[in-house]
Every structure is written in structure tokens, then in C-alpha cells.
Swiss-Prot record:
UniProt KW keywords: Cytoplasm, DNA-binding, Repressor, Transcription, Transcription regulation
Domain of life: Bacteria
TM ranges: none
Protein's recorded name: Global transcriptional regulator CodY
Cysteines paired by S-S bonds: none
Length: 259
């Protein structure tokens, strides 16, 4: 492939990702294909977002890292010291992508570190590695362009997460506001009793202890269930099993209790 063809292939990653869930594995595959190197896309917290290997490394520690999809904290933190692309780092470098315990097997191993930056902040790191042949200026151009595309997708994913969080919080607030005073009181007692995200509720016991009717409890649970905030399942004489579906619910409920 020519440099132009390789650039177009990276550009296609951005076009294909439009409106879809970000697939960092496919992005890593593309970068491995055009740069001809092992590719690791690592978040700022060391999570392995996606990777592709043209040369699999037979090392138990590396295999475990790939399985757990998590890079060591010390290594991840050290990457923040790399503020711009650092290329052709030898196996003796602290930033090497090759296992240092097997450095004698990878004496010709070379690593390139590309910071992923977007919106004025460090979003992660693109790590490339291969044996023998140096990363050329063309390779570095492709790597930095690839890092920019990955950064745009990380920002897009973060924006979607923020939007989803806001939507979840709004649903919870609407559901809680639909409750009457007595229903809200009943819900507070129910989740004090559960002391967690799920558990078994005996409505009659709570009704007797708090001094409210069982129908108030039933109505409150129905409102929350219809809003998709909780799921409830009758177990007959044993009671009702309740599970919280919206993670923001308990947070908002706690805020109300503290106000």
C-alpha cells in the first residue's frame, strides 16, 4: 500500500464509526495492518480499549494483561511523562511494550509511544511495537493520524456516556416526582430495609411498622417499575423481590433523605 492508501484506510475508520458504537478492536486491526506493528490502545487509566498483534508475544504476564484488558498502574502512570511521540524505543526503555523479563529474546524489539490527546486533555496512549525494522517517518505520520482518530472516538464515547448519565438521572427525578408524599415515604423505608440494590420485601411488615397502607407501597412500586427504575417480582407468601435497574435511583433517593 502507498502512504495515501494507508491514510485513506485510517480515514475510513472515522467514516465507518459515525453513528455507531466505537469498536477499538477494529481500529487496532486497521493500524496494525497499515503500520505493520503490534497495536495497543490504552486509556488514561490503563484499560486496554483494543489491541491487535501481527507478532503475538508468548509471555504469561503479557497474556494475562491482554486477558484482563488492563495494563499495570505503574507503567500506565509512566506514560504520562511522554508528552509527544517517542519512536524506536529499545527494549531497555521503561516504555518498552516487550516483556523485560524476556528482553534477551527481544533484543531488536522497538516500541513507539503516541500520546492520545483530545479536548485539551490526555485521553490515553497508542503503543506500537515490532521487531528489527525501525518506525519510519511515514509510520509515525500514520501513527499520529491514527492517534488523532482514536482520540476523536474516545471523546465521542465519553460524550455519549455523559448523555446517557444525564438521561438516567432525568428518568429517576421524574419517577420520584410522580410519587405522593406517603408513597415517597414508603419508598424510603423500603430501600432502608433492603440496604442495597436488590432484596426481598414483605410489604405488610413495612406497612405495619411505618403506619401506612399496603396499597401505598404497591402503588409506589408500580410507578417506579413503569418508569423502568426498578424491577419487581412477586414470590407469593415470601414477599416481593425488588431489583434496582437505574444506578442513579439510590443516589437521588439518598439526596432527598439528606435534604
Amino acid at each position: 500500500m502507498t502512504l495515501l492508501e494507508k491514510t485513506r484506510k485510517i480515514n475510513a475508520m472515522l467514516q465507518n464509526a459515525a453513528g455507531k458504537t466505537v469498536n477499538f478492536k477494529e481500529m487496532a486491526d486497521t493500524l496494525t495492518d497499515v503500520i505493520e506493528a503490534n497495536t495497543y490502545i490504552v486509556s488514561r487509566k490503563g484499560k486496554l480499549l483494543g489491541y491487535s498483534e501481527s507478532l503475538p508475544i508468548e509471555n504469561d504476564r503479557m497474556k494475562q494483561m491482554l486477558t484482563e484488558r488492563q495494563f499495570p498502574e505503574e507503567y500506565t502512570q509512566s506514560l504520562f511523562n511522554v508528552g509527544e511521540t517517542s519512536s524506536n524505543l529499545e527494549v531497555s526503555s521503561q516504555y518498552t511494550a516487550f516483556p523485560i523479563e524476556n528482553s534477551d529474546l527481544f533484543t531488536k524489539g522497538l516500541t513507539t509511544i503516541v500520546p492520545i490527546v483530545g479536548g485539551g486533555e490526555r485521553l490515553g496512549t497508542l503503543i506500537l511495537s515490532r521487531l528489527e525494522s525501525n518506525f519510519t517517518d511515514d509510520d509515525l505520520l500514520l501513527a499520529e493520524y491514527g492517534g488523532t482518530v482514536v482520540g476523536m472516538e474516545i471523546l465521542h464515547e465519553k460524550a455519549e456516556e455523559i448523555e446517557e448519565e444525564a438521561r438516567s438521572r432525568a428518568v429517576v427525578q421524574m419517577a420520584i416526582s410522580s410519587l405522593s408524599y406517603s408513597e415517597l415515604e414508603a419508598i424510603e423505608h423500603i430501600f432502608d430495609e433492603l440496604n442495597g440494590k436488590e432484596g426481598l420485601l414483605v410489604a405488610s411488615k413495612i406497612a405495619d411498622r411505618v403506619g401506612i397502607t399496603r396499597s401505598v407501597i404497591v402503588n409506589a412500586l408500580r410507578k417506579l417499575e413503569s418508569a423502568g427504575v426498578i424491577d419487581s417480582r412477586s414470590l407469593g407468601m415470601k414477599g416481593t423481590f425488588i431489583r434496582v435497574l437505574n444506578d442513579k435511583f439510590l443516589v437521588e433517593l439518598e439526596k432527598l433523605k439528606n435534604n
